[in-house]
From Swiss-Prot:
Motif placement: Cx2C motif 2: 92-95
MF (Gene Ontology): 2 iron, 2 sulfur cluster binding; 4 iron, 4 sulfur cluster binding; metal ion binding
CC per GO annotation: mitochondrial intermembrane space
Species for this entry: Leishmania infantum
Record's protein name: Anamorsin homolog
Length: 119
């Protein structure tokens, strides 16, 4: 090292700043526990879940018994984006095929599995 190039220390381990109190950083609004709220109607699916706890399954059964809810209305229609057959990475948020594997679009949404050996 040459005498003209001197290294200077940009920080010092001896000058420690006090650690701020974590409780002082929170406001009263942050301390209030927020209750998770569930939507009034489950709009993420076209039908009620198998283990429905929100009451939508009972409502659908009641409407179906009264004849106000048609069986076709409960059937899963094809999505509007046109990417339903490609897989979850390409599907829209309200796609009725979310969570299902990719399929051949010419077979009306039937999943065709490859059952051949890889070896």
């Amino acid at each position: 090292m040459s005498s003209s190039a001197t290294s200077t220390q940009a920080f010092s381990l001896k000058t420690r700043q006090p650690i701020p109190d974590e409780d002082a950083l929170l406001t009263e609004e942050d301390r209030i526990l927020k209750q998770a709220t569930k939507g009034e109607d489950c709009t993420t699916r076209r039908r009620a879940c198998k283990n429905c706890v929100c009451g939508r399954a009972e409502l659908e059964r009641k409407l179906e018994a009264e004849g106000k809810l048609e069986a076709e209305a409960l059937a899963m229609p094809p999505g509007g984006c046109g990417n339903c057959s490609k897989g979850d990475a390409f599907r829209c948020a309200n796609c009725p095929f979310l969570g299902q594997p990719a399929f051949d679009a010419t077979e009306d949404g039937k999943v065709k599995l490859n059952l051949t050996d890889d070896v």
